[in-house]
Amino acid sequence: MTKAEIISKISEKTGVEKTTALVVVESLMLEIKDSIRQNESVFLRGFGTFLARKRKEKTGRNISKNTTIIIPEHHIPAFKPAKIFKEEVKNNVK
């Protein structure tokens, strides 16, 4: 499902215009991104938590030059689904 499809579904279910739904969806995404950039988690009860996970420093290979490189410690965005959400998917996806 794409962002456009999500906006259409929200518009149909709530009766709001697509432009309003677009503003709401984009605002939600922006707030989640801003919070994660500041290393704050976003908890949505019954859905899950958006957070920044730390990746440790590690060694890797540059295959084009055949050299070893150091990949520094960094953060990546992550999503941890709520227990109830995982159960719903487990029991209903066919």
State the predicted function of each range.
Residues M1-K94:
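Strongly charged
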